[in-house]
Each structure stands twice: as C-alpha cells, then as structure tokens.
Amino acid sequence: LTLSVYATASDVLRHLAPPTARAAALARLRPLRVSRVFLEGRRGDEYVPPATLAEVRDFLAAQGLASAGGIATVPGTNFGVRQNEGLGWLNWEAEKTRRDVAHFFTENAAVFDTLIVDDFFCTGDTSPASAAARGTRSWAAYRRDLLVSLIKPLMLGPARAQRPDVQLIIKFPQWYDRFHLFGYDPERMAEPFAQVWVGTEVRNPHTRRMGYVPPTEGYVNFRWLHAVCGEKTTGAWFDHIECTAENFTDQAFQSVLAGARELTLFRLGDLMADHPGDALLAQRLPELFELAAKVRQRTPHGLAWYKPPNSDAEDNLYLADYLAQMGLPVLPVARWPADAREVCLGAQAAADPEATPRLQAHLAAGHTAAVTPAFLRRAGPTAQRLAGVKVGPAAEPTEASRVQVGARHHVLPRPLEVDGSLVAGTARVRLAGTVAGGTSVPLLTEQRTGRGRLLVLNLRTFDEGDLHAAGEWLLCPKPLGWSELPAPVAGAVREVLLAPLRVRLEAPAGVGLYLWNGAACLYNFHDVAVRVRFNGRALELPPHGPYWVERPGPARRPAAAASEGDFHGAGRPR
C-alpha cells in the first residue's frame, strides 16, 4: 500500500512553486508517508506553466518523492466551453473544448511520464450542437459514445506525440449508478488507459451538501469498478470535504478493504489547513498497512450483487450501499455470477436480457437469490411467479414506521422506504411492516423454488424523480431508514440473507461485514463501541474501525430465531 497526495493547480502555485513554501508542504507529507504527489496543471482557469511544473517535479524528486501530472476538465473563462445544463461540466462538442484539452496533454506529457484525468470527463450538455450530434440515440448512449471517441484524439494521441511511453490514468467519481447517463462508460474507457483510479470520497453521511451518502459507497464503487475494469483498478481517491476526522479515516479503511493499492488524498491545500483527519490517519497508518497486507492475500466472496455495465437503477439507486450498511457482505459483480451461492438482484440486474432464465438456472441448482420489487417489475411476470408475489405496474412509494419480528413490533427511528404495491401470493412472509393507516406490507418474503430459495426484500431507495425533487443530480438526496435499522430488525433480515453463506451477525445497522476465504472483517461506522455477536462469538467493535477475524468458522444457529414467525396476511389485497 502506498499513499499519494493530489495538489490542485492553485495548490501547486501556492504551496509548491514558491521555494519558501516548500518546507511547510513537506512537513505535512512526511507523517503520512506520502511517496507521490500529483501536480495538476489545469483546472478551468487555474493554470500552472510547464516550466513551473518541471521545477516542482525536480524538487520533489530530490526529496525522494515521485510526481505525476493531472487535469480537472472543468470549464473556465479561458478554458473550454461550459455545458448548458446545471453542473459545471464541459460541452465536448465545442471545438474550443477539444482544442484546449488536447493542448494540455501536449504540454504536460512533456513534463510527466504519468498523467491522471480527474473525474469531470463527463457531460450533461443538451445544446443544439449536442442534440444534432446525438441523432436518434438516447442522451446516455450518445454521451458515452462521444466521450469514448475523444480519448485517443484529445488525450492519448497528443500525449504520446510528446512521450510515446506516457501512462494515462482515468479517475471515476463515486456516483456509479449514474455513470452511464453522463458519459462514463468504464468498460470501454478502461481499455485505452493504463490504470483506473476510483472515487471513494463518501464524506459525511449526515450532511446535505455532498449528499447523504452511506459510508459503504466507496467500497461498493471500488469493487464494482474492479469487476468491470479488472486489475487496472489500482488507486482509491478521497477528500476532506465536510469530513470529521473519523469520516476521513473511514474512507481510507473502506478503500483498503475494497482492495486499493494506492490511496490518493485530495488535496494538498486541505493538508496545509490542518484538517484533523490527516493527523488521525497518520496515527492509524500502521493499522491500515496491516489491514492492506491481509486483504491482498485473499479473494473476497459474499453476497453477489449484480450490476451490468450501463444499467439503470430506477428506484434502486445505490441499493448496494444500503445493503452493505445493514451488515450484508455485498460483493458487486458486473457479469452474471454463475458460481455464486447467493445473488442479489435490484433493478440494475434486469438490464441483462437473460436475467430471468439465469435466475431460474440459479434456483434450479439449489442456490438462493434475493430480489427487489423493482427487479421483479422490470423482469416481468415469470420472475414474479417464481417469487410467489405480485408487484404493481408502477412503484407505490410508501414508508413503514413499524416492523414485526416474531411476536414483537419495533417502532423504527426512521421509517423504511418500501414499495406498497408488493403483494404476497404463495410466498411466505418472513417480515412485515406497518405503513400509513395501519396497513401491513411485506418486507421480506421467501418462496421455495425446487431446491432453491427466492427472497424478495421490499427495499426502495430513490429514483430520478426523488433526485429532481431535491435539486440533486448525482448523489443520495436524503437519509434512508435502512441505514438505521435497530439490531433486532437488522438481525432478522440478516438471518435469512446470510444463511446460504453460513454466516450469522447480530448487530445494529452501521456495522459492515466483509468476507474472504478463511477470514472476515467487521467495520463499525458508529461513534461509539458496539457489541455484536458474529458466528456465535461475542465481540466489541471499536468506533470507526475494523475488527479482523481469522478462520471465523460456520455460523452457530440459536435454538429459536426471532424472525421465524409467519405473517401471511401482509400485503394481501384488503
């Protein structure tokens, strides 16, 4: 594991270009064991001349630090052409945008042997020029085709003309369920780049500005991009924005648990401002390096969450983040996981035209699948018959304020977002919730299908309409109750979903579970220590930290489980 720091163009000019400022910058880098600094040459109108970059590069080399170049492809008054929609992205049909980006790579490849493209290589432009170029394609397909087509003429070509062996890195943002809408196509984009960096910058999950993003999203994003892009997926990149010290180190640990081999801290200016996360990260580096060594020796496994590339999420946006936050060992995959013991299918999986026959074969082999109402709606009547339930032609968003576990009713700290159209037919209702008016709705159903089991988890996150209503384009627009399940309710869900994996976890939501062959790791996102039971073993998890378990062994099942009550009335027509 190595650490690097990204210096924006303004950071370079302020903290590294003046010789009198360099000692202070080095004093911030040394405690974090930084071995490389990315020196950005362009961010809109912020610009560092090549001669200055070369001088800083040589200074860093004399201090034993490697360097690389970087660009944030954002518009400025004198750089590129701004798109006509709300976010500060470029219009890539504009000739000036193309000319300016190509010029950057010509200039900077002469200085650096490695260049990284920050996560603004996207667009939401709908100008007449873009509309004409789009033709009959969807906006999403057009944008992906456009940006993929520009990599070689605007980036690789100009860079290699200066330095034939130059290495280019693409950095993807964290909003994986929205990539395909705004031009990101990881499957095709990874091919021309030497390496892939992943945004694991989830920040503070309790603040609105950067979205109420679950702290598990960085892990999910990295693992899914690794599934798409393979071993090119090398680095994780996260920042200090809105973070407490603990939020900041959570990002580091989640990146390492996902398999990152390099951690890039954004940005040098925040290190110079004495963000408290840096001191805490420096203190916890031995723990982080030890964890990285353990993870690198092993192959992850768990609940295979299937998201094909370029798949729409509908009302299951960022579903996997919430599953992981509930303590389910989510393992994102981008191809059908034929050998998986258990699969999880949200609306994303239904983008695979073979999803239903593959599901049938999976069940026929005696395996387990967990699906959402959104998947069943897209997959159609055959999938609904397999599950023993029905869903309406459109989702009926509602909230469950109470959950029945066995004979007890639990009032929830935050209501659960569910689909009120789900009706249990022949399926057994394992958990039921109470929605407005006292109506009961299934939360978890089970149907035996041959030797297999098909579960329906009535989990709704949010959809395009929810984003628009909140004025949000990319990230989670509100906190969800699924992230705050009390221990008895979370345990009842886990009991059913973890059984095929021979794992048992009794804990509140906010405790993550990660599995490898012969090992497991628990991660406590809470601000206080949490007592849990894992496979029958009582453990106390420190706040904001990992707890590694070697040879966890199979789960020990208690004599009676609280979630074994049946609620066959739930979700039936009233």
Feature map (PLM): residue ranges:
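A conserved amphipathic helix/loop scaffold
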Residues: 347-574
